[in-house]
Structure formats: structure tokens, C-alpha cells
């Protein structure tokens, strides 16, 4: 019925090495043709209801649709489905208990380099390893899947919900990922589109590494240890995303350049446990953290009710920051550098809920600049023990001296045109995804 096709990839290499050196007696995957498939047209097949045990390969183009009640149970070994042919569709299947060996990249669905244009749609997956692993191919679609990791396993020992490696042209849309390591991990993959995904109770909600010209639109993260971890990438478009009740960081930018961060909503980011993850340091509950990132546009975002609104450090300069709202954060800004940063563009600044200035000419802009940090703030950052003197007369004298003699003023953030009205009300009223 089907013709076999030989394929070699990182996956097959990893499995071969494991079997060679460990002497493992893992059963070899079987062809999908060993299942009682029912024809449904040319290259179209249906899998009837029932529980099917094992791991299965798809080696020729086909459309596989599972009827309600069709379950593939992999008994804690290997990958449930291994796809090595182009133009394969897998839809409506339930995949349980695949393997947990992250070195072998055990996955519910593993897509090999030859499997261009694969479509993985509306499936349910629950297991300890990776959910959907896409390895070195292009134009894959991962749409409408429910992926649930094993909450009983340490976060570091789980697989990612959706993992893209060396992938281009992928569309990852409207998936729901829970209890994985990272929700969606994009590694060395350019030109991909993520939209409408909901990610909860993971380490990083969305994690980019060395991934350029990707778009991240209208996604939601909740209760993660970092909502959106953007690292070592350029020309990202990050628009309309929400971070709700995440810990440590809402949006983290690490070596990000020439990217656009607009229309995002971040709320209730608080200090949290990093879970032993050495990649996360500090964890002060920052709505937006910008580290060594330059030439980015950060506009029309809403950052609220977090321990720290925005923190810039390590040479994060020459970014366009305007039209954002910083509302009710315990501390609005943390910035330590050697030169002053102007946070307004073309006469339009940002909204600051703690701004105490006035607008006498009713042009919607404050008449005096907003300057969130002064020499005393810098002193407190460098020497935290000084906080014991926070309300003492000596601190008040220092603040009075720097106001009276601005010549000793140190570099910091200045918003010369602060907004008097909240510019992000639309983000507050947009319909939210229901909480699970």
C-alpha cells in the first residue's frame, strides 16, 4: 500500500547512538500501515476508534484523520508518530505516554527534514517528552493542538510543547500548551509565524534563540517563569501578546536588535522561583527587561501591577520608546548607564501613573519632564543596604541637593513629553482568552 522511504536526521542519529551504547531493547517503530486504516479517498485514511499501542512511522504522503476515540498509546517509549514524508496531515488524534528521553528527542509527533509541508492539526497530546518536534524542514503547520506535559516531572526534565529547530516558513497557530518545559521554543529558525497560542504553567512561554525575522502575534502566557524570552535574535515582530501573572519577567529581551515590540499587555509580574534555571537571574518581577538590546521600537505597550515596570541595562541604548503605559508598578523604571536616555519620539512620550506634573495648555502632554530615577535611586541600586536609611533626613538632604544643583545630576531616563491620558485603553478592553 505504501512505499518505504529512507531518511537520516538528528533524530535517527540520536536513537542509533542510544541503542548502540546503552543496549536498550526499545521496540522499533512500526509503519502506520500496520494499523486498521480505512480508506477515505486518494491518499486519505481514517483511524477507527480504539487504543493502539506502540510507535508508528509515516513514510509516504497521506492524510490521516482519527475518528473520535482513536488513541495511540506509546507505553512510555520513543515517539508516537515519526513523519519522514512530505505533505502529511495528522488530524484529530489522541497521543498518550510517549517517551521521556530528551536526548533521543522523544515526542508525540516528530517531523523529520524530508517532511516538508506537514500539517499537525487539532490533536490531543499528553506525555513527558516533547509535544511536536519539527527538525530542519519548512512550511510546517501546527494548528489547534492541545499539548499537556507531565506536571509530576521537574520542569527541566520535561520536553518543550512545540520545538522548532532550523525551520522556516512554519505557522504555529491556536495551540494550547500546559506543563511543558518551554511552551514554544524556536531555535535557529527564521521566517516563522506564531499566533493565537495559549501557554500556561511552563518555564518560558515562548522562547526564541538565534531566530530572525519571526512574528509573534496575539499569544497569551499565564503563570510561567518568563512569559516571552527573546534572545540573540533580530527583526522580530512582537505584537498584541499578553502576559498574565507570570513570574520573574513578562517580556525579556536579551541581545535583541532591529525588532518591533508593540501593543503588548503585561500584568502582575512578580518575583518568583527560577526553578533552578541558571539562565534566569535576578527574578525581580520585571514587566519588561532589556539587556544589551539596541535599535528596537518599543511602542504602545501596557505594563501594569508588577514589581518593576521596565529595566534597561548592559548598553541597551538607541531604542525608540514611546506611547507605552506604565501603570501601578511598585517601581516604574530601573536604568543605570553612562548617558541620558530620552524616552519620547517626535514629541510623544509615555504614560506614567506616578507622574505629578501638570498640563496647563491642554495639549495632552505634561509641561515638565518625567524623570523616574535620580542619584539616590542609583545609590540604592549599587548599595542595597542603604535602604535602611530610606526615610532618614540624610536621604532627604541628598534629594534636595540634586534638585537645587542639577549640575551634579547623573545620567538617567528622561521623558520630555509624558502623556497625561492612558494611551492603551484598547488593550484593557480587548477580549481575553478564558482561564483554564
Curated annotation (Swiss-Prot):
GO terms for cellular component: periplasmic space. InterPro entries: Carb-bd_sugar_hydrolysis-dom, NosD_copper_fam, NosD_dom, Para_beta_helix_rpt-2, PbH1, Pectin_lyas_fold, Pectin_lyase_fold/virulence. Keywords: Periplasm, Repeat, Signal. Pfam families: NosD (PF05048). PbH1 repeats lie at residues 85-113, 115-136, 137-166, 167-188, 189-210, 233-255, 293-314, 316-354. SUPFAM superfamilies: Pectin lyase-like. Residues 1-27 form the signal peptide. Induction: Induced in response to denitrifying conditions. Activation requires NosR and DnrD regulators. It is found in: Periplasm. The complex may be composed of an ATP-binding protein (NosF), a transmembrane protein (NosY) and a solute-binding protein (NosD). Required for the assembly of the copper chromophores of nitrous oxide reductase. Could be part of the ABC transporter complex NosDFY. Belongs to the NosD family. This is Probable ABC transporter binding protein NosD. The lineage of its organism: Bacteria, Pseudomonadati, Pseudomonadota, Gammaproteobacteria, Pseudomonadales.
Amino acid at each position: 500500500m505504501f512505499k518505504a522511504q529512507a531518511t537520516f536526521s538528528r533524530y535517527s542519529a540520536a536513537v542509533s547512538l542510544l541503542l548502540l551504547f546503552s543496549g536498550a531493547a526499545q521496540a522499533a517503530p512500526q509503519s502506520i500501515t500496520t494499523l486498521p486504516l480505512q480508506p477515505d479517498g486518494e491518499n486519505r485514511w481514517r483511524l477507527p476508534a480504539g487504543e493502539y499501542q506502540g510507535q508508528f512511522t509515516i513514510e509516504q504522503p497521506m492524510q490521516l484523520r482519527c475518528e473520535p476515540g482513536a488513541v495511540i498509546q506509546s507505553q512510555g517509549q520513543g515517539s508516537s508518530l515519526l513523519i519522514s514524508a512530505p505533505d502529511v496531515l495528522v488530524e484529530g488524534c489522541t497521543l498518550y505516554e510517549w517517551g521521556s528521553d530528551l536526548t533521543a528527542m522523544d515526542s508525540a509527533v516528530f517531523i523529520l527534514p524530508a517532511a516538508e509541508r506537514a500539517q499537525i492539526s487539532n490533536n490531543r497530546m499528553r506525555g513527558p517528552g516533547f509535544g511536536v518536534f519539527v527538525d530542519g524542514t519548512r512550511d510546517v503547520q501546527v494548528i489547534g493542538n492541545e499539548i499537556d506535559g507531565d506536571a509530576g516531572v521537574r520542569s527541566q526534565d520535561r520536553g518543550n510543547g512545540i520545538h522548532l529547530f532550523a525551520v522556516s516558513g512554519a505557522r504555529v497557530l491556536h495551540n494550547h500548551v500546559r506543563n511543558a518545559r518551554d511552551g514554544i521554543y524556536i531555535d535557529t529558525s527564521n521566517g516563522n509565524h506564531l499566533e493565537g497560542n495559549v501557554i500556561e504553567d511552563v518555564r518560558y512561554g515562548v522562547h526564541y534563540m538565534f531566530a530572525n525575522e519571526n512574528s509573534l502575534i496575539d499569544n497569551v502566557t499565564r503563570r510561567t517563569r518568563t512569559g516571552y524570552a527573546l534572545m540573540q535574535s533580530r527583526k522580530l515582530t512582537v505584537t498584541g501578546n499578553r502576559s498574565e501573572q507570570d513570574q520573574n519577567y513578562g517580556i525579556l529581551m536579551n541581545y535583541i536588535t532591529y525588532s518591533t515590540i508593540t501593543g503588548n499587555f503585561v500584568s502582575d509580574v512578580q518575583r518568583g522561583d527560577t526553578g533552578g534555571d541558571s539562565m534566569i537571574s535576578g527574578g525581580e518581577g520585571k514587566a519588561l527587561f532589556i539587556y544589551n538590546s539596541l535599535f528596537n521600537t518599543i511602542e504602545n505597550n501596557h505594563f501594569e501591577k508588577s514589581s518593576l515596570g521596565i529595566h534597561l541595562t548592559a548598553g541597551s541604548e538607541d531604542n525608540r520608546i514611546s506611547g507605552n503605559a506604565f501603570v501601578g508598578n511598585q517601581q516604574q523604571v530601573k536604568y543605570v548607564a553612562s548617558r541620558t536616555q530620552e524616552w519620547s519620539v517626535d514629541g510623544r512620550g509615555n504614560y506614567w501613573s506616578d507622574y505629578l506634573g501638570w498640563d496647563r495648555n491642554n495639549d495632552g502632554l505634561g509641561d515638565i519632564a518625567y524623570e523616574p530615577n535620580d542619584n539616590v535611586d542609583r545609590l540604592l541600586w549599587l548599595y542595597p543596604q542603604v535602604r535602611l536609611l530610606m526615610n532618614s533626613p540624610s536621604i532627604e538632604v541628598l534629594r534636595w541637593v540634586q534638585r537645587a544643583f542639577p549640575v551634579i545630576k547623573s545620567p538617567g531616563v528622561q521623558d520630555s513629553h509624558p502623556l497625561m491620558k492612558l494611551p492603551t485603553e484598547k488593550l484593557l478592553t480587548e477580549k481575553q482568552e478564558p482561564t483554564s
